[in-house]
Amino acid sequence: MFVSEDLTVNEKNHLVIGKNDTVELAKEFGTPLYVLDEDLIRKNCRVYKNAMDKYYGGNGLVLYANKAFCSLFTCRLVKEEGLGIDVVSGGELYTAIKADFPMDKVYFHGNNKTADEIELAVKNKVGNIIVDNIYELEALNETAKKYGVVQNIMFRIKPGVDAHTHSFIQTGQIDSKFGVAPVSYTHLTLPTIA
């Protein structure tokens, strides 16, 4: 049976990932077992990076969503492939730091960043912090002052759009817990960073 070029079922009816019989892997390593096909991951990284380069003239950065699978291996792999990384927690950021990921290619998201996580990001010179609310901006400003850092930021904006999808996954409406509402940023006075 053929599933895909990189994922097949062999004559023993065993799933094969990256030329590895998963039944044999389970016998050797036990279960549960995570099996990643490095060649396929690298191939997919290159597909996205090449498309970005082709259609945007190299003026973009593909980000790996570290919440998909956060490990030293994946951080190092996407670094080698020239991608950036999107982290949403102190643990994911810590893993990227330990993998010696280039901090200028790290984007720190998350709607509930702690003071310790903000400090870890600023102290390690994360490329961009995506600000989710005014309280986070104030905490970030204080931390940046403490370390004498001018931090690149982006705002996550609530566009006030009703996507007509399941209520559990709606995030663009004005009453979403994610992002800054337009009414919030029209009166926003950005703090001066020392």
Task: Locate predicted features.
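A charged N-terminal "starter" segment
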Residues: 1-153, 167, 175, 188
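Phosphate/diphosphate-binding glycine-rich loops and adjacent basic-rich segments that engage nucleotide
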Residues: 152-153, 157-180
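Short, compositionally biased segments
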Residues: 182-185
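Single conserved hydrophobic/aromatic residue that forms the stacking wall/gate
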Residues: 187-194
